[in-house]
Regions:
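Alpha-helix-loop-beta-strand connector modules within alpha/beta enzyme cores
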Residues: 47-65, 110-127
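Histidine/acidic residue-rich metal-binding segments in metalloenzymes
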Residues: 78-93, 98-178
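Hydrophobic faces of well-ordered beta-strands that scaffold small-molecule active sites
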Residues: 2-6, 34-36, 66-70, 91-93, ...
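Metal-associated gating/positioning segment near the N- to mid-region
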Residues: 1-61
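Class I S-adenosyl-L-methionine
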Residues: 23, 75-79
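Active-site mouth loops of central-metabolism enzymes
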Residues: 4-17, 40, 45, 64-76, ...
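Short, surface-exposed connector motifs at secondary-structure boundaries
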Residues: 31-34, 60-65, 167-177
Length: 178
């Protein structure tokens, strides 16, 4: 059983969670492999050097198999070949603010530049599919889940999916929303 969407946060933010505890918990729950997301760690996994640092951080801390997603941000398009050749399984981007300053969201021009590289490597492109199309959403989030849902207009997701379908058709790259 593989959990392909895990934020382990190591190196750099082990007070949130590190590989030792995350993989022990996974093993206790019957998970045999985790695939770590590229953000919430320091540095974010957007370059070959950052990926090497991530690999060094997991040494002797794994209780299950592991894999890693790299990240696509506006500043690393030229580094994608090296990152993919280093062994990440694919890449992830946000179309909206990720909440992490070191992992800014991409625009259509960044996606358009990245997708041919991803197609060449035949790897998936995971997209956080919310596209803020302007206008501020004034919904108040409280302890009710429905209040969170109200803060995320359906149009944001619909527009993001439409953009990614268009980009995937243009480039023949694989895409997925997450």
């Amino acid at each position: 059983l593989v959990d392909s969407h895990v934020h382990i946060n190591e190196p750099g933010r082990t007070e949130w969670e590190g590989f030792n505890t995350a993989t022990q918990a996974a093993a206790a729950g019957g998970i045999t492999a985790l695939v770590d997301m590229p953000l919430n760690c320091i540095p974010v996994t957007t370059t070959k050097a950052a990926f090497a640092e991530k690999l060094a951080a997991v040494d002797d801390k794994l209780w299950v198999d592991r894999g890693f997603w790299g990240g696509v941000i506006p500043q690393n398009i030229a580094d994608l070949d090296d990152l993919l050749n280093a062994g990440v399984l694919g890449v992830k981007s946000f179309l909206i603010d990720s909440g992490i300053a070191e992992f800014p969201n991409v625009a259509a021009k960044d996606i358009r530049a990245a997708m041919p590289i991803l197609a060449k490597h035949d790897v998936p492109y995971l997209i956080h599919a919310e596209l803020d199309c302007g206008g501020f959403n004034h919904a108040v989030i409280n302890e009710k889940y429905n209040s969170f849902l109200a803060s995320r207009p359906k149009k944001w997701e619909n527009d993001a999916i439409a953009l990614m379908v268009e980009m995937a058709r243009e480039s023949k790259a694989k895409g997925d929303d997450c």
